Amino acid sequence: MTRVVRVMSYNIRYGGVGKETELATVIQAVAPDIVLLQEATHPHVIARLADTAGYPHYGSRRGQSTGFMSRLPVASHAWHLPRGARHPFLEVAVVEPEMRLFGLHLSAWFSKWSERRRHFEIRALLEGIKEHQHGFHLLLGDFNALAPGEVLDVVHFPQWIRAMVWLSGRDIARDTIQTMLDANYADVWRRFNADDPGYTFPTWNPHLRLDYAFVPMKYAERVKSFEIVQAPPIVKTASDHHPILVTLD
């Protein structure tokens, strides 16, 4: 890799409808080279956002959760739907520096049933990208999952979600993120922040880390920083997720 590249992952909530100006303000303030989006379900919104924020290359598809915007030339992009998954994952092949980015949005909710689905989805994704696992690549997005050792504080949840957690045995398995670690991927946030909880959701009262970036362990040294975007202040109302930013060298 011959240049510094900054990659953002951002869940824009409800397709970003009516929030284009706020989202563009956040993205322009951070100025990433590439943005991977979740809940990017309205192509016309993504086109408008890309134009406003200054990204000539972009892709989204109606009904698909994942999309992207890029200032770097893109050789190709495609959506792949593993069997049984709720959302397709997005593959973006960047021309220079050569790398692949995989954007994903796993099933939501906190219950043993939804965690089983996420676990299935991530195993299917890893199987699907096997042919690329020897080259440099990143997996980023809204995993909707807890990492091993992280605390689930249900006091912040609505009553109906508390009930789901209670029915699941009063806690949630950590299989999804553990699968990534077992596959020899580095949890980028934890690489730089051993003790900081790294909460990304919700923006008005952060108490969950749902947004992750993973890199193959053998390429971990190429990642120079990981930031949870806290500014400009409008980030608190633009979406319910804080964006995350990974800097590569």
Where are these regions (language model features)?
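N-terminal, active-site-proximal structural segment of metallo-dependent hydrolase catalytic domains
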Residues: 1-52
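Active-site-proximal beta-strand elements of phosphoester/diester hydrolases
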Residues: 4-13, 98-108, 140, 241
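Catalytic metal-binding/acid-base residues of hydrolase active sites
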Residues: 13, 41, 105-107, 143-146, ...
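Structured beta-strand-rich core segments of catalytic domains in phosphoester-bond hydrolases
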Residues: 34, 38-116, 120
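Active-site neighborhood of phospho(di)ester-bond hydrolases with catalytic His/Asp-centered motifs
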Residues: 35-38, 138-142, 186-191
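Active site of divalent-metal-dependent phosphoester/diester hydrolases
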Residues: 43, 56-70, 83-86, 115, ...
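Active-site beta-strand termini and strand-to-loop segments that position acidic
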Residues: 69-72, 91-97, 215-217, 237-239, ...
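His/acidic metal-ligating clusters that form di-metal
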Residues: 119-144
